Amino acid sequence: MSLGWLEDVAWNKEGLIPAIAQEDRTGQVLMLAWMNREALETTVQSGYAVYWSRSRKRLWRKGEQSGHEQIIKAIHLDCDSDAVLLLVEQKGGMACHTGRHRCFFKRLEKGNWASVEPVLKSPDSIYNNSDE
């Protein structure tokens, strides 16, 4: 496949683009992460979500430690070409490193952020494999 489509992406000055992962089955927004050119290309080639970690300065395949992979169903580029939407099948039922289904679990209620989704599995058990 030609990679000319990558030239249509409006990368920011750091060479990144925000990537929204949305659950294909439910339509729920799971998370927001960042992709560089290599991450987006690898995602397309592998069929699994691969992001760029701004803190670790490296690629990371979603689920590489937890097993909670995201299988790509479709990829959309927004009207300004500066954000991508990944429609995914979320494996393991959790997208958030906090052990919740999605990262957007805090809702503003009366001037305070309230956690409105339960922890499905403790992060310690996810990343230390202590209960597997």
Curated annotation (Swiss-Prot):
It comes from Nitrosococcus oceani (strain ATCC 19707 / BCRC 17464 / JCM 30415 / NCIMB 11848 / C-107). Keywords: Amino-acid biosynthesis, Cytoplasm, Histidine biosynthesis, Hydrolase, Magnesium, Metal-binding, Zinc. Its cofactor is Mg(2+); Zn(2+). One of its GO terms (biological process) is L-histidine biosynthetic process. Gene3D superfamilies: Phosphoribosyl-AMP cyclohydrolase. This is Phosphoribosyl-AMP cyclohydrolase. Binds 1 Mg(2+) ion per subunit. Binds 1 zinc ion per subunit. GO terms for cellular component: cytoplasm. It is found in: Cytoplasm. It comes from the Bacteria.
